[in-house]
């Protein structure tokens, strides 16, 4: 399975912060925002990843993440010339995806919860159809909303409905079989001129192959699209890390625990950061 992080867009809701830098490069407490969705793919066991950015930000992402070897993975890059919809990621990434299934995660979504790794690997193991991750919200009219039956099969999906049929929002994490590329090519732009991910998901629903994985009690799904939510996400990460003495979205740790980095490589990466808490945390891992 391949992984795609969509890290384009203009981030206008975060102006003036994002006038000179991509939203997905902003810090969320102690690490860049893009570390969080990248960690999701790595926890799912995905090692071949495409990062799609706005043209003006591509070099900055390459400078931060390189070819992925520091994290035991392979990272490629592509650009989205203009924000023409989430589903466009599959058209841009067609050659990268090839004959594989694919997971798409949005570059500004943060997930945290017990047994999340197991949940991700189960979704990644599906060979047919699509899986969306749903989260219960108090204001579903602001989101894509999915309705599902007792077997967790989607029965309806709508984008920002005035009268939601459920209070389960579709998060920015999606697993698809290889048909996603051809389905995306068949989409027509919506009224706002975008290739909508909800329309792509509806094609799987009409095919009877759209599954829903709920993120229930004990899970956190954080959006970082506003000044307030960005601050809240940073506070959440800080609180969890301080209480548990564990790091969220520590890419080096995930790679090391997955057997993708040796002890020697982890120490090599940690030493230049030994004066801050992040580097000290990595060095402590080697002593346990």
Swiss-Prot record:
Q: Which GO terms describe its molecular function?
A: glucose-1-phosphate thymidylyltransferase activity; metal ion binding
Record's catalysed reaction(s): dTTP + alpha-D-glucose 1-phosphate + H(+) = dTDP-alpha-D-glucose + diphosphate
Looking at the record's lineage, which domain of life comes first? Bacteria
* Annotated residues for binding of Mg(2+): 108, 223
Q: What is the uppermost EC class here? A: transferase
Q: Which cofactor does it need?
A: Mg(2+)
Which Gene3D superfamilies does this entry report, sorted A to Z? Spore Coat Polysaccharide Biosynthesis Protein SpsA, Chain A
Q: Name one Pfam family in it.
A: NTP_transferase
Task: Give the note describing cofactor binding and stoichiometry.
Answer: Binds 1 Mg(2+) ion per subunit.
Which cysteine-cysteine pairs are annotated as disulfide bonds in the entry?
none
Keywords for the protein's UniProt record, in alphabetical order: Magnesium, Metal-binding, Nucleotidyltransferase, Transferase
Could you tell me the Gene Ontology terms of the biological process aspect for this record?
biosynthetic process
Family matches, as PANTHER family:
GLUCOSE-1-PHOSPHATE THYMIDYLYLTRANSFERASE, GLUCOSE-1-PHOSPHATE THYMIDYLYLTRANSFERASE 2
Query: What is the recorded function of this protein according to its Swiss-Prot or TrEMBL entry?
Result: Catalyzes the formation of dTDP-glucose, from dTTP and glucose 1-phosphate, as well as its pyrophosphorolysis.
**The protein's name in its UniProt record:** Glucose-1-phosphate thymidylyltransferase
Q: Which organism is it from?
A: Neisseria meningitidis serogroup B (strain ATCC BAA-335 / MC58)
């Amino acid at each position: 399975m391949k992984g795609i992080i969509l890290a384009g867009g203009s981030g206008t809701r975060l102006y003036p912060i994002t006038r000179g830098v991509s939203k997905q490069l902003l810090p969320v407490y102690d690490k860049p925002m893009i570390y969080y969705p990248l960690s999701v793919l790595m926890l799912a066991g995905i090692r071949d990843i495409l990062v799609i950015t706005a043209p003006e930000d591509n070099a900055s992402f390459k400078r931060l993440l390189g070819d992925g070897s520091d994290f035991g993975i392979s990272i490629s890059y592509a650009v989205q010339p203009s924000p023409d919809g989430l589903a466009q990621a599959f058209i841009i990434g067609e050659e990268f995806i090839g004959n594989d299934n694919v997971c798409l995660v949005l570059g500004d979504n943060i997930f945290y919860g017990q047994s999340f790794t197991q949940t991700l690997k189960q979704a990644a193991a599906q060979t047919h159809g699509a899986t969306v991750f749903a989260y219960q919200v108090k204001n579903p009219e602001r989101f894509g909303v999915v309705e599902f039956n007792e077997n967790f099969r989607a029965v309806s999906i709508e984008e920002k409905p005035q009268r939601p049929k459920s209070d389960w929002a579709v998060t920015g994490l999606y697993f698809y079989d290889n048909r996603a590329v051809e389905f995306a090519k068949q989409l027509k732009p919506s009224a706002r001129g975008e290739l909508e991910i909800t329309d792509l998901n509806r094609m799987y629903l009409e095919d009877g192959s759209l599954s829903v994985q709920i993120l229930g009690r004990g899970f956190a799904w954080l959006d970082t699209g506003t000044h307030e939510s960005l601050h809240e996400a940073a506070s959440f990460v800080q609180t969890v890390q301080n209480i548990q003495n564990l790091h969220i979205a520590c890419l080096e740790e995930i790679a090391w625990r997955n057997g993708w980095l040796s002890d020697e490589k982890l120490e090599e990466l940690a030493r230049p950061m030994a004066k801050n808490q992040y580097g000290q945390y990595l060095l402590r891992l080697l002593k346990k």
